[in-house]
Amino acid sequence: MGPRVLPLLEPGCRPQAGKWYRMAPRGEWPRGRVGHGCLFVPGGSGRVLLLGGADPAGAFADAHFVELGAHLWAPAAWSGLRPRYEHATFLSACRPPRLWVFGGAHRAGNRSCVQVLDPEIGTWESPEVTGIPPLPRTFHTSSAAIGDCLYVFGGGDKGAEPVKDQQLHVFDTVALAWTQPDTHGDPPSPRHGHVVVAVGTKLFIHGGLAGDIFYNDLFCIDTTDMKWVKIAATGDVPGGRASHSSAVFKDHLYIFGGIGPDGTLDTTYKYHIEEQQWTLLQFDSPLPAGRLDHAMCVIPWRVGKNGDAAAVSKEDKAEPTASAGDRAGHLCRGQDKKACTEDTMMHLLLIFGGMDTQAEIYRDCIVSLIE
């Protein structure tokens, strides 16, 4: 089943609560893909980075930006990334931030290497690291870093089987070193396709898959005391799922989609971190197509002076191809004088790509208002 036709959200328009929209940035769209990284990159009006991923022909080594201010797709003219999908993507906390990747898979198998982008020359480097790295694995997340460190738990081995590893691995991007700190309490069982989300000093792990078992449990570890806690959440607790997406905004964690025992999912939940309560979010039709192995992030959305005009469904106009001058250069740019002011800002969940259980690869860019 192909993507359902969602209303188009035009630049500057005010989205309505409880609705899904599609975005149609100008320029040359990236190919549909699964297992890609997805990050919001601050600076100016902000940009969304899509990195790597795969389709049935193989793994990708490309990167693309959505320029939110210009509403434009722009390829990043970088080189040297080893093709990979279902990898970890993260920005370190140093200034300026640096873009890193870890793990993932390609046609020949899983990876355990890290790479970092040199933003001055646009080249991916493979630094020498010390310590014991994790076993090669898939580990699909863009939200598992705290400060300058990436936290790795679980991941995929082969097929539906996870790596048999319940150790927490920490990669320090400053020291270029892997460590395995001692933890307390019972860790989650081995799994892959789970979401890993950093909130302050805490890591939350939800769901995942091992063989034919779909998990619906929620764990937390505070990196200040390294104690695992299984959370007895309340409310509309989501059923077991894997390969779903996640994002955090203020005091809520959001998840969308994934796959469960009965197939792909098109539901969205939010989890109140302090109250430990799940809520199933309700949306008007049409809903996005259910999907797995997609990626999601939170973006700011500027509502213009005429922003109360409703977003409408219409046929997209033919879009021009991005010129060489539109190609993304530096990762983070300086503040734009026309950057959004606080009173005109809203925030959206943005999702790109994914697939269904019939191996249809999605190429859509969909958004929904965070209330």
Swiss-Prot record:
Kelch repeats lie at residues 47-93, 98-144, 149-201, 202-251, 252-301, 348-371. Gene3D superfamilies: Kelch-type beta propeller. Keywords: Kelch repeat, Repeat. The keyword Repeat applies. Pfam families: Kelch_KLHDC2_KLHL20_DRC7 (PF24681). It comes from the Eukaryota. InterPro entries: Kelch-typ_b-propeller (IPR015915), Kelch_1 (IPR006652), Rab9_kelch_effector (IPR052124). PANTHER family: RAB9 EFFECTOR PROTEIN WITH KELCH MOTIFS. Rab9 effector required for endosome to trans-Golgi network (TGN) transport. This is Rab9 effector protein with kelch motifs. The gene is RABEPK.
